[in-house]
Amino acid sequence: MTAPTLIPKYKPLFDAPENVRYFIITGGRGSSKSFHVSDAVLKYTYSAGEKILYSRRTMTSAHISIIPEFTEKIDMYEVNDSFYVTKAEIINITTNSGILFRGIQASSGNQTAKLKSLQGVTCWVLDEAEEQQDEDEFDTIDFSFRKKGKNTRIQPEKRFYIAGEQ
């Protein structure tokens, strides 16, 4: 299979400088945001030690909406033997790096404490970030992932309130 042609504006997702912490991904329906983010995140799993947290406000239907975006790439690149896929995570068995799918809000309320307790997160993707209106809650999760000597990439998708935008 020939690798897909990537849209140039998404190139920084694949080869960002070390000092870049945030990528804010914007675009309308059909702008290939989900395609490029899932492609980049899947490729991150080929580096040992990557622990990617992929979150939305709620993740009740991740197995029918988000995870298929990743399994599509796994099929497209014909690397099925390299991945173990469940309803809550995708593990690259060649590197032991993985993607964890978690909601910020559980059905019983806020789940921030559980997200903060995740150790070693190297990348956080906040999908549908416009649903995340509580800046303090964002900061609580964001600051818990800062690791000395490790650049954690945070990728809020769509309009977001960083730098005072609301």
What is the meaning of each model-derived region?
Residues 1-166:
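Phosphate/NTP-binding elements of NTP-utilizing enzymes
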